[in-house]
């Protein structure tokens, strides 16, 4: 029997343990720890975003893909740092995004091509995952 495959969250837990990064920080924490950890996470996300934009502007598809993965990596790492159930949250956000279809199951679009919310839209409930 095959075991379950590792999720993104599992892989980031492995990375955090290997590199002595925090996992599952719970409140209340001293504000200095919270502030420094959030500052680090913000910086990592900004750096990866800039690298992604650079790769896109240079039309380097392999680099775009790498930077997309790096950006997802640091974003999931943020959730792991605070012990948030990223995989559960992602599934709820996906379900919420799928609720943007109208009653007939058709997508709605804004003028710029972005998917619009129908009257069927249900926002995700995530507050139970971050406390």
Where would I find each of the regions flagged by the language model?
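Flexible "arm" and connector segments at domain edges
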Residues: 1-68, 72-131
């Amino acid at each position: 029997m095959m075991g379950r495959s590792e999720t993104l969250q599992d892989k980031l837990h492995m990375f955090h343990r290997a590199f002595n990064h925090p996992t599952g920080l719970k409140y209340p924490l001293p504000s200095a720890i919270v502030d420094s950890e959030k500052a680090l996470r913000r910086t990592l996300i900004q750096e990866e975003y800039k690298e992604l934009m650079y790769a896109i502007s240079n039309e380097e598809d392999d680099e775009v893909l790498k930077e997309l993965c790096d950006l997802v990596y640091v974003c999931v790492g943020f959730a792991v740092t605070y012990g948030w159930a990223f995989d559960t949250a992602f599934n709820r956000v996906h379900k919420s995004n799928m609720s943007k279809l109208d009653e007939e199951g058709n997508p709605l679009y804004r003028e710029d091509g972005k998917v619009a919310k129908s009257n069927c839209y249900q926002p995700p409930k995530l507050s139970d995952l971050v406390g």
